[in-house]
């Protein structure tokens, strides 16, 4: 039976509704209820068509593992439950397979999880793209750029512990295979005012706290910092520590990330020095001092902080102190210098700190771009990831919130335009009628802000540039004049009477009705922040710094390049950047992730319906669903649709043989689905009402239960039949085995009985024979015993007789001896003095030996073992003693000679001795090698850079490194090769490139052959059948033949414990591939020179002519 494969879908095991397009009925209450139901079951992702809604869970979920990455890899968008990985995979495959540039737009409030979403997108793309050393390096650099940018650009706010205080857009560049080549990062409007002041409950940028918490004591001392946060005025103390955040560990992560991205050590140190200088700038305090002319000026209270800053940045202390006290204004040909009061001095200090940090951040982004940018010039595919600050509504909203919310308005505008455009294009592409739906277009709000003549930004620039007194109040007055009638602008001075008594709208504020809601803006600081003014004196002081990084951050401080033109305002710069970003996004295929914050407490498991409702409204999610459902709520390609519902029709089940569209048409006709409820596109089926889809799902579920019942019935029948047949076969087998067992048992009984009977008979016969043999043995033993006793008696009698006769003879001899002694003593008593001669002889002999030894002491030869001199003996009788003394002295001086050698010298002499035993009187070349030291390493491989690759490839100790001539097996010509001998291998390498050509294990070397003549040719024979012997034996020529053969012999003996066979003959055989070739040495002609020549005569002979 064919196996049925049922593919999964987001419709399977669905909690709530996975795609809001299928929600029925569709209203705000059901929308929020569906999100809450999925949120409570840890389903934080929901679709609106191809748009992903992400609800921040404020905790880690086990849905981002490598296994999950593999689950969503190369899968259909609707095949699995909603996930950010599905959108990432869809965008990546569209880029790789369809050659469409992609952009992923991540929007939402601050704290909704946009930064984490962007990191998840990048990590997924990095996981699914290609592998390889270069590709992995690019992926690692792209991923590690995030920790660096987060440390310098993110901070804790009241709504988010890791809030992005800058906008980031990264273009990731891919090659035609989909492998990453590099990337380019663009940053937008760093909130640099945070450097000098933070709202209550918020922190400065992460890097300040990470540096003080994670830097070593040595580094802090070098940067002139202390670990105590309270020492620095620029750091807020009420939120210095964040629960669950380890600043020290994060600092180590940032340092490691900077190293991976490509920052050099001195660059990282320079960055930290600038950060330390910014921190210490906040500790500079001023005091007022009156001058003679009545003007107030400021003086620095404690110059110690100023001194340390100047030491860090290598700035002249006098120059920096003057820059804090005076301001120089330059006209065309005129300079005016004025003193700064205390308030102006503090303004100058804070402006310097903000500009220094802001420019450092821009330098960091450019430095990262240099490292991660694509190195090739080929055409690239691009995937853009936009992680930009979310819509912000605080108690006090200033210029930064105004700019941030303007950017979000533009993103909402492009979302509306591209969503409608994509929907309309799909209907046109599929030839489906398009039904228009009304929606709120926020273009009117964008125009209120960015209009070149009457826009708020244009009027702010105009106010900043006009002469005269310019304040935030004059700017507000101008807004009231121009924008008073605008329906989305509110102010106490506007012409609408209902705002005149609105106590929620202060006189110094204005309110804009954004797409996300109304936001009240304090005009205080708008003009200053837009001007972004830094006194020229401070710029010039920074340019004079000996610190190369700080000097590069202030090019306008160069006196040789004075530019009197006013720099562009912050608002105009940001407006131009946003316009460029919008144009960039419109050229790419958009993918949307809409992030939603479930509560303001940053806590898990809390779902604030009113807060979520507000976000749903201003994000326009309901309108997005209605746009998707304006024509048809559900659409699917024909193939997966037929695959999913084919069991509902007999004609399409189990296999449809024909086009998928025809199968779907047959299926829908069979199910009698009304024509007005569906339409057939070119490649997709479109279903108008979600109820129709759910009816299909119910029918499919019921049909699957019926199929399951059918499969169970067939399976149970098959199982019973199989069991019956098995029992039947088992009965036959059991009966056969039982009969066999019974016959075997009966045979064993008969056999056992026969053996018992046989054993009893054999035993009876054996016992009978044994009794007869024992009787015969006893008779023989009795006769032997009687004879023995008789012979013994006779022997004892004879022995007694012989002993008595011997005693008598001995007594006679003793008596005779005594008698002779007495007789002799009586006869020679008169000659007693004759004994003195013996004594004189012995004395004389002793004196001669003594004199001999004393003379030998003074005549001893030198201690050289090769000195053959030895004094002559004076007397013949001392000959043996003389030779023995010579032998003993020679052994003694040899021992003394050996004792003075080092281990290295002993090894050299052992090798020389080995060479002598192997080649003396056998090889004519040997005598010339005696005086030559064995060097081994004739090539300095370790020192020669040309052989670095060869050196890295050899991990063992090199015993011989020499250039030899390898004889070509085919024609006898020679080729230079590097001959290398290690502890375990013999290697041949190319002399020019150092590439290893051959590697032979010493265990495969069986013999070395050479001639007896004065030449350097030798053959290395290899074990037959070994891998190294595939081309045959080697034939070499070398000027150091004796040394190479000796070391090869000793090394082989040390490693294999077997002596290497050394054959010395003027004719020997070698194996060249499949042929055995005779190498014959002949006497050469002197006319051909003194160098031996080699020539291949035929397939069986190779001649070597030795002159």
From Swiss-Prot:
The modification Phosphoserine is found at residue 60. Residues 923-1107 form the TH1 domain. One of its GO terms (biological process) is actin filament-based movement. InterPro entries: IQ_motif_EF-hand-BS, Kinesin_motor_dom_sf, Myosin_head_motor_dom-like, Myosin_TH1, MYSc_Myo1, P-loop_NTPase. Residues 15-701 form the Myosin motor domain. Keywords: Actin-binding, ATP-binding, Calmodulin-binding, Isopeptide bond, Motor protein, Myosin, Nucleotide-binding, Phosphoprotein, Repeat, Ubl conjugation. This is Unconventional myosin-Ib. It comes from Mus musculus. The lineage of its organism: Eukaryota, Metazoa, Chordata, Craniata, Vertebrata. The gene is Myo1b.
